[in-house]
Amino acid sequence: MMTKEAPLIALVAGEISGDILGAGLINALKLHYPNARFIGVAGPRMIQAGCETLFDMEELAVMGLAEVVKHLPRLLKRRKQVIETMLAEKPDIFIGIDAPDFNLTVEEKLKASGIKTIHYVSPSVWAWRQNRVHKIARATNLVLAFLPFEKAFYDRFNVPCRFIGHTMADTIALKPNRAEACVGLNLDEAQRYLAILVGSRASEVGFLAEPFLKAAQILKQQYPDLQFLVPLVNDKRIAQFEQIKAQVAPELSVHILKGNARQAMIAAEASLLASGTAALEGMLCKSPMVVGYKMKAMTYWLAKRLVKTKYISLPNLLADEMLVPELIQDECNPENLAWYLGNYLADDADHRKQRNELKQRFTELHKLIQCDADAQAAQAVVDVLEANTSDQN
């Protein structure tokens, strides 16, 4: 058993979402080890929680192949720096938070030298490039997974994994407050709204804005009182969306919001959104949704051959059934999108019953992954530190 009251705990986050997770974990670990020291690569929230950072986390926050290639020399230099620092400092444990392309190599080197390692947030190995599970096994003492089907995947390969629940499920109420969301967005609660989320990446907005806007035009003809909420992550995406809208739907009135996706989905009767975290957030907001996704033809051709799952959206993966429509590539056209959304907007008894049943399933799935993830993650770290990893829940 470890008797050290002030362990040295190392953490590396590579983007904003990881910084949020890291800060929550640090604060939860302080309850176990008030005198612990935290070092690594941290963003502003982790630094505020007390983590010393080797360099600015933003240096690791690159997305897309072109960006990675452009910054590869710097990324490799920073990875070497992290490995050398950790080998010199000899932390009691190293926790790589997401950023698997960076962290798994660090973890593998450190584990080989006798340092305990945890990878926090499972890469999507269950969906594609499943052979990565062998590298994960070599690199980690334990994987912390947000979702139960991720743990089931690791169990098949005898890789230690603990399901801790999803932090997002801890931050959203089981019964979201629509009135509060409308007030927060300065919206009239008596109006009808549809939330349209075209994704956070430039490529997603480029592919999805046009079919999503054209679907909105069709719905506006059928439901003249329907209004559209379009939350976008930053000014660049807003400008990109407005440029596309000016070409394909100049006369359509929409409420463009900077951020506030969660409030928009709570305020709206239904959501049209890109696959990804937004679909999980929509489920937790109890928003009936249609998932649409388009990509380059070659990317789609490759994805069809590489992706190993029946579904692409997290609500369907969690439920292991087609709870919400998934319209991919050619099926992601305005007519299809509008037809499926119409099922959520129709006001007859049958459609109301279907909507209520869907929201009930969303609530059940919310409860499944609402486990106080920060506390669960901290307990897992304590167990590995104290070498009590036999019970992986």
Swiss-Prot record:
One of its GO terms (biological process) is lipid A biosynthetic process. GO terms for cellular component: membrane. Keywords: Glycosyltransferase, Lipid A biosynthesis, Lipid biosynthesis, Lipid metabolism, Transferase. It comes from the Bacteria. One of its GO terms (molecular function) is lipid-A-disaccharide synthase activity. Transmembrane segments: none annotated. SUPFAM superfamilies: UDP-Glycosyltransferase/glycogen phosphorylase. Pathway: Bacterial outer membrane biogenesis; LPS lipid A biosynthesis. It is an enzyme of class 2 (transferase). Its EC number is 2.4.1.182. It catalyses: a lipid X + a UDP-2-N,3-O-bis[(3R)-3-hydroxyacyl]-alpha-D-glucosamine = a lipid A disaccharide + UDP + H(+). Belongs to the LpxB family. HAMAP family: LpxB. Condensation of UDP-2,3-diacylglucosamine and 2,3-diacylglucosamine-1-phosphate to form lipid A disaccharide, a precursor of lipid A, a phosphorylated glycolipid that anchors the lipopolysaccharide to the outer membrane of the cell. This is Lipid-A-disaccharide synthase. It comes from Actinobacillus pleuropneumoniae serotype 5b (strain L20).
